Amino acid sequence: MKIMLISGSHRMNSQSEKVAHYMAQSLLDNGQATATEVFSLAGNPLPLWDEGIWNGDAAWQALLNPLSEKLAASDGFVILSPEWHGQVPAGLKNFFLLWGSGELAHKPALIVSISSSDGGAYPVAELRMSSYKNNRICYLPEHLIIRNVESVLNADASKNNPETDRYFRERIVYAGGILSAYANALKGVRESGITHSDVFRFGM
């Protein structure tokens, strides 16, 4: 089972990417995935959507096809978003516009919101409300909000708040188990063929 983690921060060396790499290793260590991969939006590697995607533009195909294959080969996802001004970063919202060929469809995804303080709820609501319609990603009823992120999940234990760090490490294992179970279950749904339709390609 392969789980792909999407780190949605544009910043280099971001806290979101730190959490993504920690979670990728946690999934492996706890037998919740056999392979993981982190894809980071640091530095904006994906241009803003334009009609060239629909028209089969060669430059878009060269950029997206390798990533499309990795997404299609994944059984589930972890979507990590920092809270910027109470919002999901533009690059992460743009990410969801790029996949309309079933790469994400009917696959489970765990939302992980990242906050440097006590916030983090707004990205969860925004992603659940508006990022799934046409790509048909399936968000779990479980999510994580990693608050005061600078003080948890650091490799240097002296930088962690011991009690809070322990809580988030345990909660990540719990959520990873749910993601893994959903990934197994939804594989059967996709293989049944019931989700395939050339008539109803877009959500309502």
Regions found by a protein language model. Give the residues of each.
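Mobile beta-alpha loop/short-helix "lid" or hinge segments that flank ligand
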Residues: 37-48, 101, 134-158
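Short acidic capping loops at alpha-helix termini that bridge into adjacent secondary structure
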Residues: 34-35, 106-108
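N-terminal beta1-alpha1-beta2 submodule of the flavodoxin-like/Rossmannoid cofactor-binding fold
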Residues: 1-97, 160-173, 186-204
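A glycine- and small-aliphatic-rich helix-loop capping segment at beta-alpha/alpha-beta transitions
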Residues: 94-102, 129-134
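Acidic/histidine-enriched, beta-strand-rich ligand/metal-binding domains
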Residues: 90, 103-104
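Short, glycine-/small-residue-rich phosphate/pyrophosphate-handling segment
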Residues: 108-152, 167-170
